[in-house]
């Protein structure tokens, strides 16, 4: 009933966020014209997949998709009309995309467009030429052989995307085990490849694993600094953005008067949500806090012709801003342990 219910929505979102991050949704686009196969389907497990409706190659990829147990896999078939696939992807609630049935350039363009519109979807492509995007993971590997035979990198992107979709936000994909890999070409310079935004496969005494879990972002700016290159950090950023936007749209838009008191109630709700993410997504030792944005309020007032030079900060914060809500948050995300330096004295 009213605002208390909205507050509960935000707290529920915190619980939902951690649950959802345990097993995310994967979308797979295949080139498969098997008679009787649906153009679009969703499966919760490999047991639900009708093997007879797919080619042997497609079914092999779907087995890889389910290896890490994502919550669900949306399967689409790329036909002559490629726009139909992208229209479907625009409405499907997936987290990660792998599309061996489409050109990587099309996938990269789609993901960049979706992210520019505020949707936190991501994709895994293979051996692409510098996607340079925090939403694109560029799997770079060659001469890949699995237990059941050779496979090209674009097809194996399905396995990696499924792994990333299933991975909880408490973990990084760095050194994630790839038990099905028998061999692959070794990177000539792993450090250089990682710095170039490439996700590589490395080998050790215990088998093959993913290298450092980075996305393809290489051009750093003040708005997108080094943390944006880490897959784990971007998962947290996208999750928080989506959960808060969803709660605001369902509980506030058109329903709550936009005065200062209600802005504070919204801030309180957001802070309660952020508190629930500390320790797994956010650094619990940091002051992760949202507040009404003084600069946002001031800039809006100035754009409306109001001279704020003689206004007190409290007056600016309390000022009427029409339908606009300006908030700001200072967040510190929690990465996973990946590097160790141990000094031993004897």
Regions found by a protein language model. Give the residues of each.
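Extracellular Cys-Trp
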Residues: 58-175
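Intrinsically disordered, low-complexity boundary segments flanking structured domains
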Residues: 12-17, 58-65, 84-85, 186-188, ...
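Short, surface-exposed beta-edge/turn micro-motifs
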Residues: 23-25, 93-95, 120-121, 186, ...
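Extended, charged amphipathic alpha-helical segments
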Residues: 163-223
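Generic alpha-helical propensity signal that fires on short helical segments
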Residues: 26-28, 115, 176, 181, ...
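Structured, hydrophobic secondary-structure cores that serve as assembly/anchoring elements
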Residues: 1-58, 171, 202-346
